[in-house]
């Protein structure tokens, strides 16, 4: 493990231990930090600069083995064929130092406290945030295989408070489209390669599915992933092309879960500490 990697892990472990000890977490419990205080907004739609045209942020979510990775690749080829600038991203990004720690955890090569690994997953998204915004502003559409919703669903499935799980994600860019590939956990378990990593167990996936239900809102597009690959692909293409067109016309960026609810305010500064990990 590199020095930078071990330093990040040490900080994450310290923060994770603090959060575990304080089951009722309040702002006055937090250690001092030089980060700029994060302002909570009552609306999640915040314009970032004057953008005439930009790329779309499209996120595919769902249980393990629901078909996300295959559909992401198909969407990439489709948009490239239409002449759009487009890239495929995946979270966790296992190429970074934080991502390598996550990869070791997922492959059962290491063990971390549940709160600690959640903060590392969030840090993995934060370390790509500035690049993500720059790519979108430059007109590149990003097809993203898993995002913050996965982090929240999987951690809350372990019994961690869902608002606590959402708090480190506050301030990340919100997707223009969330495409949820819906499949019963039992059906997903029948697909090849299931069970290779830490979370790929039927009972846990059932809990994850329940947590996804809590996260869904009217903006999500729910796709029946039990259909043929071709039928799923056809539906996704139509939705994504509409979003790409809207973003080229200057659709404003939004931020994730910006709110003024009591729980958001109570846990809101977690995002500052996640950024401090990097």
Task: Give names to the regions the model predicted.
Residues 87, 177, 221-223:
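Structural signal for short hydrophobic segments within the conserved structured cores
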Residues 2-52, 76, 186-278:
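NTP-dependent small-molecule kinase module
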Residues 82-173, 235, 242:
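ATP-dependent small-molecule kinase phosphotransfer cores
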């Amino acid at each position: 493990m590199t020095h930078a990697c071990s330093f990040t892990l040490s900080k994450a472990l310290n923060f994770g231990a603090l959060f575990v000890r304080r089951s009722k977490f309040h702002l006055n419990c937090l250690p001092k930090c030089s980060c700029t205080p994060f302002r909570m907004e009552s609306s999640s739609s915040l314009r970032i600069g004057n953008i005439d045209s930009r790329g779309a942020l499209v996120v595919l979510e769902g249980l393990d083995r629901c078909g996300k990775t295959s559909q992401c690749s198909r969407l990439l080829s489709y948009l490239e064929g239409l002449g759009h600038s487009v890239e495929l991203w995946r979270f966790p990004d296992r190429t970074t130092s934080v991502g390598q720690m996550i990869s070791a955890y997922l492959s059962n090569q290491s063990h971390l406290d549940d709160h600690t690994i959640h903060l590392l997953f969030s840090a993995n998204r934060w370390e790509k945030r500035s690049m993500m915004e720059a790519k979108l502003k430059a007109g590149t559409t990003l097809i993203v295989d898993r995002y913050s919703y996965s982090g929240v669903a999987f951690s809350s499935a372990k019994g961690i408070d869902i608002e606590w799980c959402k708090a480190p994600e506050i301030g990340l860019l919100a997707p223009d489209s969330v495409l949820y590939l819906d499949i019963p956990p039992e059906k997903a378990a029948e697909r090849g390669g299931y069970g290779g990593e830490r979370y790929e167990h039927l009972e846990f996936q059932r809990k994850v599915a329940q947590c996804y239900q809590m996260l869904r809102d009217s903006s999500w597009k729910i796709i029946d992933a039990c259909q043929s690959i071709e039928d799923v692909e056809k539906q996704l293409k139509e939705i994504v092309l509409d979003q790409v067109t809207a973003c080229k016309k200057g659709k404003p960026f939004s931020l994730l879960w910006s709110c003024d609810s009591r729980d958001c305010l109570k846990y809101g500064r977690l995002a500052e500490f996640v950024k401090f990990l990097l």
